[in-house]
Curated annotation (Swiss-Prot):
PANTHER family (alphabetical): ATP SYNTHASE MITOCHONDRIAL F1 COMPLEX ASSEMBLY FACTOR 1, CHAPERONE ATP11
Protein's name in the database: ATP synthase mitochondrial F1 complex assembly factor 1
The protein's assembly and partners: Interacts with ATP5F1B; involved in the assembly of the F1 component of the mitochondrial ATP synthase (ATPase).
Organelle targeting peptide span: 1-46
Membrane in keyword set: yes
Organism this protein belongs to: Xenopus tropicalis (Western clawed frog)
Pfam families according to UniProt: ATP11
A Gene Ontology BP annotation from the UniProt entry: mitochondrial proton-transporting ATP synthase complex assembly
Amino acid sequence: MAAAVVQMSMGYRGLLAVRNRGTGPLALGVVSSQLRAFSVRKEPELDENPYYGKYRDKIQQLRRTNPSAFDARLDKRKELKQQPLGYSKQAEFAKTVEEKVGTASGKGFSKNKTLDSILNIELIKDKDADEIREIWKQYFSLRNSVYAVIPGESFELIWRRAKTCPSFLYALPRKEGYEFFVGQWSGSELHFTALINIQTAGDAAPSQLILYHYPEFQKDKGIVLMTSEIDTKFLNVQDAQCLANQVQLFYGSDGAETFGLVEKFNHKSDEFKYMAVVSFLEQSGLGKSFLNEQGHNKEDKLE
């Protein structure tokens, strides 16, 4: 798709808007020169950012509870702008961040969410893969969660790649553009944190989504169980599903181009082009499908 950049919020790196100008798709992994020309030269005031209101409570909580830390992190914003977009300290705080700040829901994410805290493993260990899959589906089908039963071989590829490339930048389509999230693997958990949170709160930025993977049945049954916890003040189930689908796209696809982008983000950040993430998302159809689903959900609510 030929595209032109629509300048929003004076070039803020956490939000990018793209307007279609034609019907032809971009080649897979190719970003037009217009997209590369996207300007980030002027930094907006924090409260001018279109997503600031969404995270205001978290930021204000940090300001109230630890004002010196808040001021110090604001001072670092200029330094952060000079670093490659691929740079992130997520690996250092993904496991501890919820303990420091907690989530907006008030109860925080679960700590040490093991498989036996969800299901009685002893009761299902003798069942076959199809039976376990059906039990998992029935358990989560009425819950506000994203869940899956992943083929063992597929997860093995994702897991092997996650060990060498534990973080990546994901784009969540919005009506006005894209909201970016950094995903960071911590063991078999995958934490997602909004880029604007990282830029403003640093290592105190809380996650908005965690995907939990359970490989207990991978060897014997050939399946890996997955579920999630969502901070529903910031993300809905459709948002979380879109991010989870992108994990399969970038970590689980056979194509070298998609995982090559993940490798650049982790090991060659100076070569990483964040608009290539949008290009792959549009080429795969995930972005369009997500926006269509969001539109249908809004129509259903109006009826």
